[in-house]
């Protein structure tokens, strides 16, 4: 029977913390710590797309992964012009995984780059990077919503990842470096909130493995990922961000003072935008004989044009 160095049971993951806004200059960021593995994840938004997507009306999510020189026991040379092959492969894995979280058309013609830099490596760096990058991505999207650059969130799925393996003939989850270096079977699992697999990377390092062992690893991984997703939600909630986007509420007005006032009132529950920010800038003929009637005409017109629930300015009548 395997005895793990830190006393964990085979099915138990390491302690996890996720600190949002770790890099204040980034559009979104977090520091994720899984045991002694520590990874900074940042998200940067650019208002353009790669050449192969220009004019197609959709955005792009990509990633870069690197390890700081002192992140392991021996100094790792920094990437130069020729990037480390392992780092390139992991960068592609992170990018593929996080694109599964986003409706690229709803993102619009902009690029979000997720940079994952390993401060300290003790196994599971790529899976920690994916889990942390999801949080950084949500933070960046929240900023775009707050700035009125997006009217609805393009986030469609929650993504997290964990490592599993067979060590001393025992299936276990969330391997540290010592366990990973002698694992007989090594696997990385990426899943969404529905329990669907986004990516599986698995190999028999020291021997082949059975269907029963594979099933045990998948079950352990799914349980571990569910716990990681709760950590993601908790860290985002602490900074008043949420994976499920706040609905958009349009105000039938261009009065910025009124918009700010309603954002202050409803901002915890709705993304409040002006009718111009929602794409409506046409004159409205107010033909009713009462204040409430004209407010209704204005709100109904804006709601019909934008397809979004609309709040009449001073009357606070709501139309959907």
Where do the protein language model's features map onto the residues?
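Alpha-helical protein-protein interaction elements
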Residues: 14, 57-59, 201, 258, ...
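N-terminal polybasic phosphate/anion-binding patch
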Residues: 245-309
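Polyanion-binding surfaces on beta-sheet-dominated domains and ring/shell assemblies
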Residues: 1-244
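Catalytic metal-binding/acid-base residues of hydrolase active sites
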Residues: 316
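Short, conserved beta-strand segments within well-ordered enzyme catalytic domains
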Residues: 31-33, 40-42, 62-64, 250, ...
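Active-site flanking residues adjacent to catalytic metal/cofactor-binding acidic residues
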Residues: 116, 312-313
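Conserved small/polar residues in nucleotide/adenosyl-binding loops
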Residues: 319-320
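Secondary-structure boundary/capping signal
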Residues: 106, 240, 270-271, 310
């Amino acid at each position: 029977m395997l005895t793990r160095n830190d006393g964990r049971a085979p099915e138990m993951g390491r302690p996890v913390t996720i600190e949002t806004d770790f890099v204040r200059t980034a559009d979104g960021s977090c520091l994720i710590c899984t045991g002694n593995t520590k990874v900074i994840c940042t998200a940067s938004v650019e208002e353009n797309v790669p050449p192969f997507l220009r004019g197609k009306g959709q955005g792009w999510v990509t990633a870069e992964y690197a390890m700081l020189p002192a992140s392991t026991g021996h100094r790792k040379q920094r990437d130069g012009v020729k990037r480390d092959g392992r780092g390139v492969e992991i960068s592609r894995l992170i990018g593929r995984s996080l694109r599964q979280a986003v409706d690229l058309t709803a993102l619009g013609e902009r690029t979000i780059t997720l940079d994952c830099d390993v401060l300290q490596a003790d196994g599971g760096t790529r899976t920690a990077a994916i889990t942390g990058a999801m949080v950084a991505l949500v933070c960046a999207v929240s900023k775009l919503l707050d700035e009125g650059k997006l009217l609805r969130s393009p986030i469609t799925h929650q993504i997290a990842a964990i490592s599993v393996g067979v060590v001393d003939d025992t299936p276990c989850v969330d391997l540290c470096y010592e366990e990973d270096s002698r694992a007989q079977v090594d696997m990385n699992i990426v899943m969404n909130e529905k329990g669907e697999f986004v990516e599986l990377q698995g190999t028999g390092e020291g021997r082949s493995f059975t269907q029963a062992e594979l099933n045990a690893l998948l079950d352990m991984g799914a349980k571990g990922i569910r716990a990681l997703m709760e950590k993601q939600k908790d860290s985002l909630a602490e900074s008043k961000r949420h994976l499920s986007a706040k609905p958009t509420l349009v105000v039938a007005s261009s009065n910025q003072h009124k918009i700010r006032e309603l954002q202050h009132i409803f901002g915890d529950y709705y993304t409040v935008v002006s009718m111009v920010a929602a794409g409506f800038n046409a004159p409205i003929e107010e033909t009713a004989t009462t204040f409430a009637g004209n407010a209704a005409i204005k709100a109904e017109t804006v709601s019909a044009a934008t397809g979004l629930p609309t709040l009449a300015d001073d009357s606070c009548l709501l139309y959907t």
